[in-house]
């Protein structure tokens, strides 16, 4: 059995919980999906999903709770969406706490402010996916070994590095479980 933790410090936690639970059920795998609020809870999961929200607040709370240290020390696979993408970076256009798990530079709010939010069909992993972009970041540059999975309007919106996945958009707000399934399959390969 694997345990997937949804970081529950701030952001759209319930949407990720529901989507991840639905995904493991559809996949027919033995998995538990739980909220992670403390370093102790972070130590009990095989992977963590960091949702959208306010990246500065989430980063600060991850430091205060010790969750950041657990993720880094125990090399937990992480999927970060929107604010989670920002937190996975090792550099951003704003001074804030970061995990630094992916060699990339991210620009916060690259697609504009809240009123500029939009939805678009994107190509990712050889298929179409409905992307929901809310004050979305974008990757400005990636280091060696970082795989670019998708671009939109010449901006990088999805990358993978090892067992870590960063998405500029919100797959948890749609109906398609494809990207959650992709991440869970990666986790299964990483924890074997």
Curated annotation (Swiss-Prot):
Q: Which PROSITE patterns does the entry link to?
A: PDXT_SNO_2 (PS51130)
Q: In which pathway does it act?
A: Cofactor biosynthesis; pyridoxal 5'-phosphate biosynthesis
Q: Does the keyword Cell division apply?
A: no
Any idea of its EC number? 4.3.3.6, 3.5.1.2
Listed under catalytic activity are:
aldehydo-D-ribose 5-phosphate + D-glyceraldehyde 3-phosphate + L-glutamine = pyridoxal 5'-phosphate + L-glutamate + phosphate + 3 H2O + H(+); L-glutamine + H2O = L-glutamate + NH4(+)
Task: Kindly identify the residues recorded as the active site.
Answer: 82 (nucleophile), 170 (charge relay system), 172 (charge relay system)
Query: What is this protein called in UniProt?
Result: Pyridoxal 5'-phosphate synthase subunit PdxT
The organism encoding this protein is: Methanothermobacter thermautotrophicus (strain ATCC 29096 / DSM 1053 / JCM 10044 / NBRC 100330 / Delta H) (Methanobacterium thermoautotrophicum)
Where is the organism placed in the taxonomic lineage, from the top?
A: Archaea, Methanobacteriati, Methanobacteriota, Methanomada group, Methanobacteria
